[in-house]
Amino acid sequence: MKSLGNNDKFMQEGLEYIKQIVNRRGSRDTKLLEICRFLNDKFTGFDWVGFYFSDNLKKELILGPFIGAPTEHRNIPFGRGVCGRAAVSGTTVNVADVMAESNYLACSLEVRSEIVIPIFKFGQFVAELDIDSHQSDRFGNSERQFLEQVGQIISVIF
């Protein structure tokens, strides 16, 4: 159970588990950290999994809970890097090869690909789910669709 492929059962079970996390008692950050841990544990190549919260007034992203190597990118201006680009576009950004990305903020020399899922609540951009991989072209269509559903599920806790 380390990669989705076309495994609809795995996908459904994962979404159900994330719904259970969201519906538990506890703080938002505790729930988000548990979701990070789940994604990191269940998917090979999800090497850094974390959330950035949106400060729409300052037009910047603020680092939230994450699993993986520490990052110096605690605040990211909208438009800067892959995360900042997703904040501006409001759409998922999937980068197969970060080395070919001119607007890339390097978090680690090991990172090869990245996917960022914007999260909205009542039409307002509130956060992002950011996942880095040490594998090139790690995130396929199945993973993208799954992660976008994760974003929809967790939007209620913002």
Show the residue positions of the predicted features.
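Sensory-domain boundary capping and coupling elements
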Residues: F120-S133
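A short, aliphatic-rich beta-strand micro-motif
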Residues: S113-F120
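Regulatory sensory and allosteric helical modules in signal-transduction proteins
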Residues: S54-A106
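Juxtadomain coupling helices with adjacent low-complexity linkers
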Residues: K2-S3, M11, K19, S133-F158
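Intrinsically disordered, low-complexity terminal regulatory regions
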Residues: M1-F66, P70-T71
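Short hydrophobic/aromatic beta-strand element in the GNAT-like acyltransferase core
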Residues: W48, V116, E128
